[in-house]
C-alpha cells in the first residue's frame, strides 16, 4: 500500500511541475527568438506575468491528468 501511495504522489507531483516548467521555458526562448528576428529586446512585464499565469493554469491540470494516467498504467502493468 505504501509503494502505491508513493507512486501516486510521484506521478501527481512530478508531472504537473514538469509541464509547468516546460511551459515557462517558452518565455525566455520566445524573447531570444524575438531578439534574433527584430534586433530589439522588448520586455513587457505585464504581458509576461499574464503568460506565466496562463501557463500555470494550463500546465498544472494537464500534468495532473498525465500523472494520474501514468500512475494507473503503472498499476495495470504490475499485475
UniProtKB/Swiss-Prot annotation:
Listed under GO cellular component are: plasma membrane
Q: Where is the signal peptide?
A: none
Record-annotated membrane-spanning stretches: 12-32, 51-71
* Entry keywords, A to Z: Cell inner membrane, Cell membrane, Membrane, Transmembrane, Transmembrane helix
The record gives the membrane topology as: Multi-pass membrane protein
Q: Where in the cell is it found?
A: Cell inner membrane
Coiled-coil ranges per the record?
none
- Write out the function statement from the record: Immunity protein component of a toxin-immunity protein module, which functions as a cellular contact-dependent growth inhibition (CDI) system. CDI modules allow bacteria to communicate with and inhibit the growth of closely related neighboring bacteria in a contact-dependent fashion. Protects cells against CdiA from the same strain, its cognate toxin protein. Growth inhibition is reversible upon induction of this protein, occurring about 2.5 hours after induction, and requires an energy source.
What subunit structure does UniProt give?
Probably interacts with cognate toxin CdiA.
Protein name as it appears in the record? Immunity protein CdiI
Question: Which species is the source of this protein?
Answer: Escherichia coli
Amino acid at each position: 500500500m505504501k509503494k502505491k501511495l508513493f507512486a501516486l504522489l510521484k506521478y501527481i507531483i512530478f508531472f504537473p511541475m514538469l509541464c509547468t516548467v516546460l511551459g515557462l521555458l517558452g518565455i525566455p526562448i520566445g524573447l531570444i527568438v524575438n531578439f534574433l528576428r527584430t534586433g530589439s529586446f522588448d520586455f513587457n512585464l505585464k504581458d509576461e506575468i499574464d503568460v506565466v499565469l496562463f501557463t500555470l493554469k494550463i500546465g498544472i491540470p494537464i500534468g495532473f491528468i498525465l500523472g494520474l494516467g501514468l500512475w494507473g498504467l503503472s498499476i495495470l502493468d504490475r499485475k
